[in-house]
């Protein structure tokens, strides 16, 4: 005689489980140096996706559209035309006091 032992398993997960509870890690985008702030060459000014703010004077653009300072100076956000925003860095002389 042929006998088959068939056991059935639940096809639903049961009470208490949820399909929620995941989220992606934040990317920490945004302005990192405000208008009028002194920055050193290489400092990040804006982290962004796409060019919402374009590079101006003494500002470079990384491959991920991050804007960074190419020279030491003060950050200035400017608007050119109707809808284009630019970030520039203007060099400034800093007096260094010598302790005697």
From Swiss-Prot:
One of its GO terms (cellular component) is cytosolic large ribosomal subunit. The keyword Ribonucleoprotein applies. InterPro entries: Ribosomal_bL27 (IPR001684), Ribosomal_bL27_CS (IPR018261). The keyword Ribonucleoprotein applies. The N-terminus is cleaved by ribosomal processing cysteine protease Prp. Pfam families: Ribosomal_L27. One of its GO terms (biological process) is translation. It comes from the Bacteria. GO terms for molecular function: structural constituent of ribosome. Residues 1-9 form a propeptide. Keywords: Ribonucleoprotein, Ribosomal protein. Belongs to the bacterial ribosomal protein bL27 family. This is Large ribosomal subunit protein bL27.
């Amino acid at each position: 005689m042929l006998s088959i032992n068939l056991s059935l398993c639940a096809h639903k997960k049961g009470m208490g489980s949820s399909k929620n509870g995941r989220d992606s890690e934040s990317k920490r985008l945004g302005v990192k140096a405000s208008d009028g702030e002194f920055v050193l060459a290489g400092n990040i000014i804006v982290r962004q996706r796409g060019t919402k703010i374009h590079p101006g004077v003494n500002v470079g653009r990384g491959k991920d559209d991050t804007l960074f300072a190419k020279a030491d100076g003060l950050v200035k956000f400017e608007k050119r035309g109707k809808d284009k925003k630019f970030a520039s860095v203007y060099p400034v002389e800093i007096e260094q006091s010598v302790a005697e």
